[in-house]
Design a protein with these regions (language model features):
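Conserved catalytic-core segment of NTP-binding enzymes
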Residues: 29, 154-155, 161-215
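Extreme N-terminal, non-catalytic leader segments
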Residues: 2, 9-51
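Residue-level signature of catalytic and energy-coupling elements of molecular machines
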Residues: 43, 54, 80, 88, ...
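Phosphate-binding loop that captures ATP/GTP phosphates
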Residues: 75-126, 138
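Conserved, well-folded catalytic cores of nucleic-acid-processing
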Residues: 46, 50, 72, 91-95, ...
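Phosphate-binding/switch loop-helix module in NTP-utilizing enzymes
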Residues: 123-171, 190
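Short glycine/serine/threonine-rich phosphate/pyrophosphate-binding segments
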Residues: 56-64, 85-89, 160-168, 189-193
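Walker A/P-loop phosphate-binding motif and the immediately C-terminal alpha-helix
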Residues: 46-82, 198
Length: 215
């Protein structure tokens, strides 16, 4: 399992650790990449769940956080942005497929009332392989935001694939992210990535951050 989780509100450290691509684009150019959400959805906060490598418990953290927020009375949704390796539906006990109406794609709900969209819920068989190149995958991630009827949500958690490839880049460029959760494991190399992010946030003067170490 992971041994630490860092939560940093994105809007407070955007100028400091927003990613390598922000250094090459000004604010106006960045805004031009943002896509409009579903016209019938009202999402108050979008939180990205990220990790430097796979197998550190990122999706487990996503599900646990979603369940905790739901238990507190918040309306929660999960976007499984790991298009080629989706795991959220099975972890949340979802087997039914998505439906569609005049408002968009309707995501199924878990037993806790958490709305979930995932490529597995759109495939005919969940075991079917998704063999697509980066641009196609990135486009699907955007469609999960623009074409899905989320309704009213307090939190939309975006479970991303590990690393800094096409999907995380697309999410940070195209969606109005409010915060991120960085998930790491006991290995020193992985923990180093998160510690660097934490130190950068601290140097940037961010007050809304937390560090948790599990024994």
């Amino acid at each position: 399992m992971y041994n630490c989780v860092i939560i940093i509100w994105y809007e407070l450290f955007e100028s400091n650790i927003g990613g390598f691509w922000r250094k090459m684009m000004n604010a106006d150019v960045k805004k031009s990449f943002l896509v409009n959400g579903n016209a019938f959805s009202d999402i108050k906060r979008i939180i990205g769940i990220v990790s430097g490598k796979g197998g550190v418990g990122k999706s487990t953290v996503t599900c646990a956080l979603a369940r905790r927020l739901a238990s507190m009375g918040y309306k929660v949704g999960i976007m499984d942005a790991d298009i080629t390796g989706p795991s959220i539906p099975r972890m949340m006990g979802i087997a039914e497929r998505c439906e569609e109406n005049d408002k968009g794609i309707v995501p199924p709900c878990s037993a806790e009332g958490i709305k979930i969209i995932s490529m597995n819920l759109l495939l005919k068989n969940e075991d079917d392989a998704v063999i697509w190149r980066g641009p196609v995958i990135a486009n699907w991630v955007k469609q999960f935001y623009t074409d899905v009827y989320w309704g009213e949500l307090d939190f939309l958690l975006v479970d991303m694939p590990p690393g800094t490839g096409d999907v995380p880049l697309t999410v940070f460029q195209s969606l109005p992210i409010d915060g991120i959760v960085l998930v790491t494991s006991p290995q020193s190399l992985v923990s180093m990535i998160v510690k660097k992010a934490y130190n950068m946030a601290a140097n940037g003067g961010s007050d809304e951050r937390s560090y948790r170490r599990n024994s």
